[in-house]
């Protein structure tokens, strides 16, 4: 389980990866185009609320009863994620994201970094 889909859901629409690990780059190339509409909606919700796209993604997880535990690379990401606890999505926002997720052309692998 990856609440931010390995960071995909925190990436702004139109974002392209820099050089990264071969596995992560491969995943990004596969997942980014198919998640564009969903990420556009998350960016729009974030802009309307004055919050980040990461906060929208984490709130979307929380709206389904999950307690997301994202991984962080930088301290600023911890602060950003903690701000997601200060608000919740409306039913309309959640419904929009749910529908776009169903319509998405790609699915996140179960756990691409899990060892056997």
Question: Residues of each region from the PLM?
Answer:
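Aromatic-lined glycan-binding groove of carbohydrate-active enzymes
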Residues: 1-18, 52
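Helix N-cap / loop-to-helix initiation motif
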Residues: 51-52, 74, 90-91
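Hydrophobic, secondary-structure "cap" segments at the distal end of domains
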Residues: 59-60
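Phosphate- and divalent-cation-binding pockets in alpha/beta enzyme and binding domains
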Residues: 8, 77-80
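Hydrophobic faces of well-ordered beta-strands that scaffold small-molecule active sites
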Residues: 1, 68-70
């Amino acid at each position: 389980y990856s609440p931010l889909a390995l960071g995909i859901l925190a990436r702004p629409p139109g974002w392209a990866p820099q050089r990264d690990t071969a596995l992560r780059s491969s995943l990004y190339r596969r997942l980014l185009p198919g998640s564009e509409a969903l990420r556009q909606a998350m960016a729009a919700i974030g802009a309307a609320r004055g919050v980040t796209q990461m906060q929208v993604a984490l709130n979307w997880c929380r709206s389904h009863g999950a307690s997301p535990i994202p991984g962080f690379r930088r301290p600023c990401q911890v602060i950003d994620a903690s701000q997601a606890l200060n608000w919740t999505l409306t039913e309309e926002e959640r419904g929009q994201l749910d529908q776009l997720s169903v319509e998405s052309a790609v699915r996140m692998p179960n756990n691409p970094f899990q060892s056997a």
